[in-house]
Structures are given as structure tokens and as C-alpha cells.
Design a protein with these regions (language model features):
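Hydrophobic anchor at the beta1->P-loop junction of P-loop NTPases
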Residues: 2
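Short amphipathic alpha-helices and their capping/turn segments at secondary-structure boundaries
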Residues: 14-19, 57-76, 99-112
Length: 182
């Protein structure tokens, strides 16, 4: 599981790892959801900064879970996920001080083998779906605390793209040698 706030290299890393291991990766559902929603709006109503209404949170989480379940049907030994339901919960708590009960229920049905928490030591890139570098830092701290509080297995990856890739490979080789070294 590639985990972390916005603009920390999760998507790039997921793509690189899926190519390296000749497997599939699951993109972040929220990005597709927002792109589709914004594409359906007339140009005059599109905004510079995209926001998500609290009423949309559950549908986004359902879409995230459905996409994760679909990719698991590939029967690959190793899969890479660019974000997950835990991220949905953290963002819901951050922006609305509330995690919808439906998301809490869905969280109890998922299990990820390992989390790679992507550090914020790479340059933040603007995107209408991203708020700011300052919020990225705040969310990174919340995500680290979440992993610790929930006793989830994780490793922090940092540095350049190549350094991050090599760190993930090293952890995978040590934690999952029977899968990685096939």
C-alpha cells in the first residue's frame, strides 16, 4: 500500500513497481471521481480549487473499495495500491471532523499487508485537486500517527524517486522474499 498525503510520489511509485514486478496497480479512485464530476460541468462552473462535499465521502469510499476488490481478481502475487480506505478516513476526519459510519464499516473489511508512507521531502506540485504544501505536511503527520495508533506495519520512504523505489524494493525483499524473489 502506497500511503501518504497529496503530491508525495505515490502514483509514480505504484506505476514503477507494477512495471518492475510485471503486475497491476490500483489508482486512487478519488482522482477519477473528481475528474468525471468536473468534466460534466459547464466551463463557467469549473473551479480553480476542487472541493469534495461531505455528502460525497461515502460514494468515494465505495468506489475506492470496489476498485480495490476488482484488482484483487487479477490473482497476482503482489499488487500495489495508490492510496486506500484508510486515506479516505483520514481525509474525512481532517476536513469534516467525522468519519462516516459506512467508511468505518468498510475499513473493518480490508487488510493490507504493508504500508509505504511516502514522505513529503519532494517538491509539492500544484494540481486543482491538491490544497497546499502546508496541508500536505499536516496530513503526513496525521497519517504517521494513524499508522502507529492502529498498529499497522509500515516503512517511511523518502528521497528522490529512484531512492524511494530502491527503499521499497529493499523492504519488500526483506519482508516478502517468497513473493518478491519468484
Amino acid at each position: 500500500m502506497l500511503f501518504g498525503p497529496e503530491s508525495t510520489g505515490k502514483t509514480t511509485l505504484a506505476k514503477q513497481l507494477s512495471v518492475h514486478f510485471k503486475t497491476v496497480w490500483n489508482p486512487e479512485f478519488l482522482r477519477y471521481y473528481v475528474d468525471a464530476r468536473e468534466a460534466s460541468k459547464p466551463d463557467a462552473t469549473k473551479s480553480e480549487q476542487i472541493t469534495i462535499a461531505e455528502s460525497e465521502l461515502l460514494n468515494i469510499a465505495i468506489g475506492q473499495l470496489a476498485s480495490e476488490m476488482a484488482i484483487q481478481e487479477s490473482n497476482s502475487d503482489i499488487l500495489f495500491f495508490d492510496t486506500c480506505l484508510h486515506t479516505n478516513a483520514i481525509y474525512a476526519e481532517h476536513y469534516y471532523n467525522n468519519v462516516p459510519e459506512g467508511i468505518e464499516r468498510m475499513l473493518s473489511s480490508v487488510n493490507y499487508d504493508f504500508f509505504f508512507l511516502c514522505n513529503t521531502d519532494i517538491e509539492w506540485e500544484y494540481d486543482p485537486q491538491r490544497e497546499s504544501a502546508a496541508v500536505r505536511e499536516l496530513l503526513y503527520d496525521k497519517m504517521l500517527t494513524y499508522l502507529i495508533d492502529n498498529n499497522l506495519p509500515y516503512s517511511i520512504v523518502s528521497g528522490t524517486g529512484e531512492e524511494r523505489f530502491n527503499q521499497v524494493l529493499s523492504v519488500l525483499n526483506s519482508k516478502f522474499p517468497s513473493i518478491v524473489n519468484k
